[in-house]
């Protein structure tokens, strides 16, 4: 994938998510976002239901628009597994729970700090393996810089949910196979 094609994809996005102003991105603007990503996030904390706090790194409007534009681009890389109920249209917490109706036992596990546990290195490897020779290592680095904060996937970025599902796809396949082997059901819900 050439840099020009990537920039054209972002430059042509003029939809307005969540009432934001239409935005087109020049190569200079994208470069600025990649070279100084720390300037484009606003950190804050939210209380967790279970106690403690969840650290959010919300992208500033321009970077948020870039990430919002990239999300469908990343979505083309995979088809979510049937067992994945996080951040998929029409597949929420209720549909996730329905998978387990009638079961005698239920095991609920939480992956602590799931978003920031996904590193920039992991994402780069994933991009290179999924796109193969279409994506140069340089372009993979560019994508990673646009969607990570301090080398990690941030909570609060519009591209993070689809990327967590992409990273977890192999895990889903393995855990679903293991569950099936033992006569159990597996699903993954992310909120």
Model-derived segments and spans:
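Alpha-helix initiation and N-capping motif
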Residues: 24-28, 63, 67, 80, ...
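Non-catalytic, polymerase-adjacent accessory regions of viral genome-replication enzymes
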Residues: 1-43
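Reverse-transcriptase-like RNA-dependent polymerase core
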Residues: 30-49, 136-146
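A broad structural signal for alpha-helix termini and local helix breaks/kinks
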Residues: 11, 74, 78, 131-132, ...
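Short, conserved non-catalytic motifs in the polymerase core
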Residues: 44-67, 85-89, 108, 145-165
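Short amphipathic beta-strand starts and helix->beta connectors
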Residues: 39-42, 91-93, 178-182
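Active-site-proximal segment of RNA-dependent polymerases
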Residues: 63-108, 112-116
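Conserved polymerase palm-domain catalytic core
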Residues: 99-190
């Amino acid at each position: 994938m050439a840099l020009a094609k990537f920039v054209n994809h972002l430059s042509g996005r003029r939809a307005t998510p969540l009432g934001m102003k239409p935005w087109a991105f020049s190569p200079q603007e994208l470069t600025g976002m990649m070279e100084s990503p720390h300037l484009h996030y606003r950190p804050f904390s939210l209380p967790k239901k279970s106690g403690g706090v969840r650290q959010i790194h919300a992208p500033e409007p321009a970077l948020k628009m870039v990430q919002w534009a990239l999300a469908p681009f990343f979505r083309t890389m995979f088809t979510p597994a049937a067992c994945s109920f996080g951040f998929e249209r029409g597949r929420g917490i209720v549909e996730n729970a329905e998978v387990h109706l009638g079961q005698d036992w239920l095991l609920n596990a939480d992956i602590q700090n799931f978003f920031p546990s996904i590193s920039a290195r992991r994402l780069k490897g994933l991009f290179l393996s999924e796109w193969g020779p279409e994506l140069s290592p340089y372009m993979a680095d560019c994508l990673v810089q646009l969607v990570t904060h301090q080398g990690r996937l941030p909570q609060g970025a519009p591209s993070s949910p689809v990327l967590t599902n992409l990273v977890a796809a192999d895990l889903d396949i393995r855990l679903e196979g293991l569950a099936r082997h033992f006569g159990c059901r597996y699903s993954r819900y992310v909120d």
